[in-house]
Amino acid sequence: MRTLGGFTFPCDAPVFVRVDFNVPMDEVGTITDDLRIRASLPTIESLLGRGAPLILISHLGRPVKNEQQGFSLKPCAERLSEYIGVNVPLVDFLDLDTKLYGELTRHLDKSGIVLFENIRFFAEETSKAQADRRILAEQLAPFAGAYVNDAFGASHRRHASVYELAQAFSNKAAGFLIESEMQAFSHLASEAKRPYTVILGGAKLSDKLRLIENILPTVDRLLLCGGMAFTFLAAQGCETGKSLLEESFIPEANKIIDFAKQNNVELILPVDVIEARSLTSPLGVVSKAESISYMGLDIGPETQSIFRNVIQDSKTVFWNGPAGLFENPSFSNGTRALLDALSSSSAFTFIGGGDTAAAVSLLGFDYGDFSHVSTGGGACLELLEGKILPALEVL
């Protein structure tokens, strides 16, 4: 994979930079967490500093045909303008014709940078038919002379702007964000100091099964929380009440438990939970994990203490998946306790993207409190599952 260190610019031709500005927004379109925009700045500022005219491409959300309201990248263009001190025009390029060349030239002559409107407004971007995606890539390619991918969070997709468009260029590279993400994953894979602890939460075991199978032989401790923990508790004969449970995966949970025992991996499950009658309950009660009557929605204080002690005794910690329903303040204490323990740890602390990264901001922590916070959710998991990311393979 070529990086920006070995990247050469075409004479006078713009450079496509595929960024990931898929940021959360509230109901009025205000960005609530701009981690992904800030993470793109080193690449953008470096290229601008070298005199390269930039055409940024990104997606936002999952717009459906003829429904574009709420999916415009305008707030992202405005936020990026604030960060780099240059007006970043948002260009609506739904008509890919010769008129666009003139519009792009005017904007690039003035600002040196533009942001194309949401690439997913083209149905071909996410089409399952490679021929459709290739058509879009072929329409876009003439507008630039080189291609840089810095959209780590989209690199597990075979979408036109990260896969087929990259294939259209011989002069291409990965941006600094992707480079830093891959360095962090390399650290986990080959340089992790021990004890090496992995914390996995989130809703379903089925979503993390391949990940667990891939990393279990390499770790010293596996801490399980969130909804997925109830499948393991049920496998051990615990009453899980109305908690999220994947009964069909209980045999898989038993296999993981047995493998951990045979390979001296310490597998730690919650010993107490915060349970409530519904997801919107204003208050939960502490219950022992083996006898839950209603819905377990967070780890309890005893489990928080156990997990905290394990983190303090670790040299490397990877965490993906919240400990509970952290969006509800009544069930956020477990996730907050893990963030607090990790932020004060001297270990190499890696926060897997998605909901876990969102919890950092929502619960009042700073991304700089941790060694690495990934900008990728699905991409992060697929790398840890041992998969090759398609968009990086074509770089």
Curated annotation (Swiss-Prot):
The keyword Transferase applies. Substrate binds at residues 20-22, 36, 59-62, 120, 157. GO terms for molecular function: ADP binding; ATP binding; phosphoglycerate kinase activity. Belongs to the phosphoglycerate kinase family. This is Phosphoglycerate kinase. Keywords: ATP-binding, Cytoplasm, Glycolysis, Kinase, Nucleotide-binding, Transferase. Its main location: cytoplasm. GO terms for cellular component: cytosol. It is an enzyme of class 2 (transferase). It catalyses: (2R)-3-phosphoglycerate + ATP = (2R)-3-phospho-glyceroyl phosphate + ADP.
